[in-house]
Amino acid sequence: MNVTGLPLPLARAECVRLACSTVPQIFAERVAEVADEVAFRYKENGVFRELTWAAYWQRVRTAASALLSRGLRPGERIAIIADPSAEYLIAQLGAVIIGAIPYGIYPTSAAGEVALLLRKGDARIAFAGDQEHLDKLLDAERLAGARLLEHIVLIDDRTRFVYDDPRLISFSEFEGSGGSQDIQALLNRYIAEVTADNPVGLIFTSGTTGDPKGAFYTHAGMMVGLGYGLLEVMGDLRLRPHRVVTHLPLAHGMGQALSLYVPLFADVVQHLPERGQSLTSLMKEVRPTHFLGVPRIWQKIAAELGVQVQSSGWLRRHMFAWAEQMGHRRAAKLRSVPNAHPCRRFEPLWFATYRLMIWPALYKLGLAHVVGAASGGAPIPSSVIEKWQAWGIPLRNIYGSTEAGMLGSPADIWAEPDAPLVQTFPRSVESGPDGEIMASGGGIFAGYWQDDAATRATFDGKGRVMTGDIAEYTSAGSYRIVDRKKDILITSGAKNIAPAMVESALKASPYVSEAIIFGDGQKYLTALLEVNFDVLAQWARSNDVQYTGFSTLIAHPAVMQLFEQEVQAANHHLARPEQVKHFRLIPKELDPEEGDTTPTRKIKRKHAYAMFKHLVDEMYDTA
């Protein structure tokens, strides 16, 4: 099965077939079609190595055999705590093809959360990416006061000699341990017995308001809701072969969709980094043609580029500003034509300024060859989308949820920053009570693992998933995300405020990494701001602001004046009740490993208030 280049009706017909298929079936079909073509590339010892589809399938079968030899059986779980790697993909799919259930643990998780997820998933075998990840597994067991795992496989085993644990083996030892004839017969039997409605894996929720819950998908649900769903919300990913970089955590649904499942039925070749390699370095080497990132990544790269330009000489600053202005005009023209494809030869002036000023900057970032781009996982400021579109990157926002898969994207490739979203085949999106998004159709999750009460609470009487997201709906059936239902604030003046909209306006500043809005039951809104230290430090050097460390920098009068200006600039785009009256800078960089945020850096609002209650109270005491 290959949907790349197919007309949309034919691609959707293939999607219907996915709903009746299993991962091992689709994998085997892919191998039969393109056995000698590259499945993915991974960097090792400074060199990119290729794995063909035939070799990929063989290594996945080898991993499955090794799991069986260690007693794993269909329906049982394995856990993986690691950064993206070839071994991660192979281990996860090795479990999937025999009907076992893998789940990822974010490498940034604190030891307490690792212990919780090991218990919730009841994993028998765990894979650790390196020494740091292995230490988290062992610390989790110490916190739990019990041995939670039967076997531990260490992917990067350079420090294995430090440990004296009989459960611990290297990945190479693991791969060489399942070759008996009895195991091979068992492997073939279990592959044949997997059905489309068997669980394929768990994806744990972010845990912003409580303990994470393990959402589980069936084989069909995963491939339709997250795999094919990603092609629906990013149609340009389906139109031609693409080169992508693998950087999203594979514990996340979006990361799994792009790295594990989309390549099974679309011409997407992923490129995995060497251990410890930065995303910027990887992009420079790979020069991807499509890039999917969370808002934080798009904002960070844009902010760093902007500060570099502002720190340059007068001539370059003005030339870049002129090129950017031309880019804004061009993007506006493209947005006015449905599904417009840029044709540079008809825009000679823009092309000249683009090649002279913008293209070199994008080339240095590794983004000069990107023809398709999307942001997902959280709201992204409209100004960030506008900036990237002015730079020639057709960035747009996509929407999905852990429980409902990929649900919506703008109708056009070059979309307005706040363009309404249209529902994705084969799901239906409707308005529920209070404007909550209700999702139904193919590709919805099957429930929360061993939590029937939470599962029942997530579905309404019509079998629709209650996403918890509030939206505004148009007469044409499209919708705009407003905020999480649980996060809506009501001021003492009875005004309903969506914090995400205000926070998004504040995070449009290159100096703001995170914003947290308060004001429920109060007369006005206040904000805690996490500074983007790297960008702020560049600004300080350019403006001769002296400091000795983080604390002295954020307390500097010039910095406070800068943030006052940034907040006022954000307020200019907000209605009066939404404007921020007071703010404070968070006196540290938020760290997921210390529990400041979720592992994906989502804000835990109650926890944030508890940590910085004195700052919030101070902003209201000054009234």
Language-model segments: residues:
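Conserved AMP-binding/adenylate-forming core of the ANL superfamily
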Residues: 19, 39-93, 110-115, 170-175, ...
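Conserved ATP-binding/catalytic segment of the ANL
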Residues: 428, 432, 436-491
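AMP-dependent adenylate-forming
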Residues: 26-51, 584-590
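Conserved AMP-binding A3 loop
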Residues: 50-54, 200-226
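Conserved C-terminal "lid"/linker of ANL adenylate-forming enzymes
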Residues: 489, 514-517, 560, 564-623
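Conserved AMP-binding/adenylation subdomain of ANL enzymes
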Residues: 223-243, 250-355, 359, 364, ...
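Structural core segment of the AMP-binding/adenylate-forming
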Residues: 69-70, 93, 97-176, 562
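Conserved pre-ATP/AMP-binding loop-to-beta segment of ANL
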Residues: 36-38, 169, 173, 178-204, ...
